[in-house]
Amino acid sequence: MANASYNVWSPLIRASCLDKKATYLIDPDDFIDKLTLTPYTVFYNGGVLVKISGLRLYMLLTAPPTINEIKNSNFKKRSKRNICMKECVEGKKNVVDMLNNKINMPPCIKKILNDLKENNVPRGGMYRKRFILNCYIANVVSCAKCENRCLIKALTHFYNHDSKCVGEVMHLLIKSQDVYKPPNCQKMKTVDKLCPFAGNCKGLNPICNY
């Protein structure tokens, strides 16, 4: 079904920026416990998106959080490094420099970050490394000022706007009900072969070092 006349909404778009008279396509996974799907719901884009009015979308975004959302938010909370990456929107180097300057990353994460930086194609068999890096960042970095929007935009540029890579970031940082952790240090050394200095870092997981 054509969707050329509809705006595709993403979590990066604030409620205040919506056109209440427009029509949007949204991912229902972004509104778990808030949006009810029925047999009459019309899906678009191969069954991934649903159509919604701008006014209703505004109501969903400004509605008080549900009990499940509060529980999930409390579960996700942990000490993180508060870093605004708003300026990291012009290429890979800015993102890498910012992370290197602001976080005391373990050697395995530094290696992954540099491997992804040097790789001209964001995919190319790099899924495992992307997953580990994204999980690490999701667990140790946040931006209270931008509500993580700057972080998502920075990673979007880092991955050259590749739709699959950006989708992975959105899932881990926004849509997932749980915050995935990177593999523990033992697996990083024996399975992923990415840990050159086993036993020299704090804790049993890369996220213990930041």
From Swiss-Prot:
Keyword match Transcription regulation: yes
Leader sequence segment: none
Keywords: Capsid protein, Host cytoplasm, Host nucleus, Transcription, Transcription regulation, Virion
Swiss-Prot/TrEMBL GO biological process terms: viral DNA genome replication; viral genome replication; viral transcription
The protein's role, per its UniProt record: Plays an essential role in viral DNA replication. Does not seem to participate in the initiation step but is rather important for the amplification of DNA. Also required for expression from the vp39 and polh promoters.
Subunit structure: Interacts with the DNA primase.
Record-given protein name: Primase-associated factor LEF-2
Species the sequence originates in: Autographa californica nuclear polyhedrosis virus
